Amino acid sequence: MSTLLATPSAGWSHLSFPNFDTTLSYIDDVALILLQDFILTYLKKQVAAVTFDCEGYDTTLVLSNYDLYGIQTNTEPASFTHILDDHVREFLHQLVTNIETDLDKWASFSVFETDKETYKKETAKNKTRLQALIKEIKEHPNYG
């Protein structure tokens, strides 16, 4: 599976699959949401669903044990896409890898502070939180 989650740049990122693509905005703390609310929920054997504000429309991802679905509200009616099946574990590993590879950029992605010192502190705090979540995910018995 190729890179799913693009390196954040200028307040935007992309989540891409062969049959589904969405833009993700700095309005949401994308890395935190994906790690904490999506991957960890899934690893606890629960259906995980997250919604992102894409500035003009919403994208919702729904992950079950074997399938990933995407819902986008930028069409009328909203589009519902079966994104993948049977590759859920590979998908989760790729998301973690993509976030880990660009950890510094993800740590600062949704920091809105204009004061330089406050910005540095918030970014450092976010980086520590993301690192802790990645560690927790990698140590989870259902991740392997």
Regions found by a protein language model. Name each.
Residues 1-82:
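N-terminal low-complexity, intrinsically disordered segments
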Residues 66, 70-144:
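Long protein-protein interaction modules used by eukaryotic assembly/scaffold proteins
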